[in-house]
Structure formats: structure tokens, C-alpha cells
């Protein structure tokens, strides 16, 4: 299935849903990108993996969510939680502080086509291509940090 890129301004952020990122073999992965409203250059925090960028943390991982809220009750402070996803830093907390948040569905997962091949050389190359893409965008200052629990 093909997904169309959609951009909008919502909740004080520029959000691009299903951002295409072309890999070295021509396959296009899909990402969601959350940016500050200003036209500056910002550092990027990226997550990448098979956990489906469109799956809410609270809905898709109920037991982990419950344990997190019990252990760290302030998790929701300053957030509506509507953009929270597994392994993604909360855009509502980081974007206002001047970061771009990028969440990429890996090959064959979520909104990205292809066949999942976890921890393979192909997946490593895809991740590399995504990092390089993020570091060279007009809104990026070239610094790309990675976030994840298992990825």
C-alpha cells in the first residue's frame, strides 16, 4: 500500500506524516517528522524500527504503558500524549525546546514497504540512509541523535 505525504501545523509543531525517505536501492521508507514552527536549523532525535510509527504507545503496549505511568507519574506532564509512540521521545516535550523528532518505520514495518529483515546488513544500511537524510535536510543543523530501547 502506498501512503501520501501530508504536512500540517498542529499543536505548535510542523508535522509531516508519511515523509518519504529513499534508500540506496530505491525503496522508499516512511517517517513522521515533528519540527518547530521556526525556519531555523535544529538538531534531530531519530527513532527507527519495526514498531509501527502509527501505533499509540498507550494502546499498542498497554502493560508497558501502565508500568511506566506507575513508575514515573510525571510522564504525561506537559503532554496530551497523542503523539507518543514506542521508543519515540515525546514530540510535545522536545519540539518546543528546539529539536526535530523523526520516527521511521523500518523496511516492511508499519507504513514502509518491503520485507522485514531485523538486524540485517540491509536494515543497518537503511538506518544509515535515514540518518544521512535527516542530517542533510534544510531544517537540520547536521546533528542527529538516536533514541531507542531495543533499536
Task: State the predicted function of each range.
Residues 2-40, 44:
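N-terminal cap/lid segment of alpha/beta-hydrolase-fold proteins
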Residues 40, 50-56, 101, 133:
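Serine-hydrolase catalytic-loop signature spanning alpha/beta hydrolases and amidase-signature enzymes
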Residues 41-50, 145:
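Short beta-strand element of the alpha/beta-hydrolase
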Residues 85-86, 96, 118-138:
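Alpha/beta-hydrolase active-site loop
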Residues 139-151:
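Alpha/beta-hydrolase fold nucleophile elbow
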Amino acid at each position: 500500500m502506498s501512503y501520501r505525504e501530508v504536512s500540517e501545523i498542529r499543536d505548535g509543531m510542523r508535522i509531516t506524516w508519511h515523509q518519504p525517505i529513499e534508500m540506496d536501492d530505491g525503496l522508499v521508507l516512511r517517517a513522521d517528522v515533528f519540527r518547530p514552527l521556526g525556519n531555523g536549523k535544529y538538531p534531530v532525535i531519530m527513532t527507527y524500527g519495526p514498531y509501527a510509527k502509527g501505533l499509540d504507545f498507550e494502546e499498542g503496549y498497554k502493560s508497558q504503558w501502565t508500568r511506566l505511568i506507575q513508575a514515573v507519574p510525571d510522564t504525561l506532564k506537559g503532554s496530551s500524549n497523542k503523539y507518543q509512540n514506542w521508543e519515540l521521545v515525546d514530540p510535545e516535550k522536545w519540539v518546543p525546546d528546539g529539536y526535530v523528532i523523526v520516527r521511521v518505520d523500518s523496511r516492511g514495518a508499519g507504513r514502509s514497504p518491503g520485507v522485514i529483515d531485523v538486524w540485517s546488513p540491509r536494515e543497518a544500511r537503511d538506518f544509515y540512509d535515514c540518518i544521512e537524510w535527516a542530517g542533510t535536510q534544510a531544517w537540520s543543523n547536521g546533528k542527529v541523535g538516536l533514541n531507542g530501547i531495543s533499536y
